[in-house]
């Protein structure tokens, strides 16, 4: 794994965090407790800060970077090969595999960005919705079952990461 400073700013890593051997965490990155950073993920805080809340998972091949601060809430799942670039992702949200969330976009809490979707720069979406498409649009409101699924995904990754320690 690569954990290194950028211009004298070091990453801050919370308690009980799993970081895979092939992940890269650089510069102004703050990771909350019980998080997991999976294989080939790149968290590059050499532009603006990256802040990740508690119990969140950054899956294989994800890139977090940006010209604006990147904020990932608590209990968030960022799926394989997704890109979050200078955006805000609310608590209990799932970013699907291969999704792209661009600069200054805001995803409300308790939401899902469907796999392969593109959230364009500057878009703000309310909480509790399913976003889908290129460009991403609200398809429907989430059910309580959907929201519980998001929370279960985050919990599963906390539990799974503990098996790697």
Predicted regions and their residues:
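Structural signal for interior beta-strand "rungs" in well-ordered beta-sheet cores
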Residues: 6-8, 12-126, 130-131, 136-138
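Short, glycine/charged-enriched secondary-structure capping and boundary segments
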Residues: 127-128, 145-147
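Charged phosphate-binding loop/patch that engages nucleotide di/tri-phosphates or the phosphate backbone
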Residues: 154-165
């Amino acid at each position: 794994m690569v954990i290194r400073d950028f211009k004298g700013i070091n990453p801050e890593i919370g308690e009980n965090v799993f970081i895979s051997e092939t992940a890269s965490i650089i510069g102004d990155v703050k990771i909350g407790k019980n998080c997991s950073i999976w294989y080939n993920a790149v968290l590059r805080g050499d532009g603006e800060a990256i802040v990740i809340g508690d119990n969140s998972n950054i899956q294989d091949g994800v890139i977090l970077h940006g010209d604006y601060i990147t904020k990932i809430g608590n209990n968030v799942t960022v799926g394989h090969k997704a890109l979050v670039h200078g955006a805000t992702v609310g608590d209990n949200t799932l970013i699907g595999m291969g999704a792209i969330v661009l600069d200054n976009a805001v995803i409300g809490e308790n939401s899902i960005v469907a796999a392969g979707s593109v959230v364009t720069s500057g878009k703000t979406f309310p909480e509790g919705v399913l976003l889908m498409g290129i460009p991403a649009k609200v398809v429907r409101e989430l059910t309580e079952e959907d929201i519980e699924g998001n929370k279960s995904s985050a919990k599963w990754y906390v539990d799974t990461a503990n098996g790697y320690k």
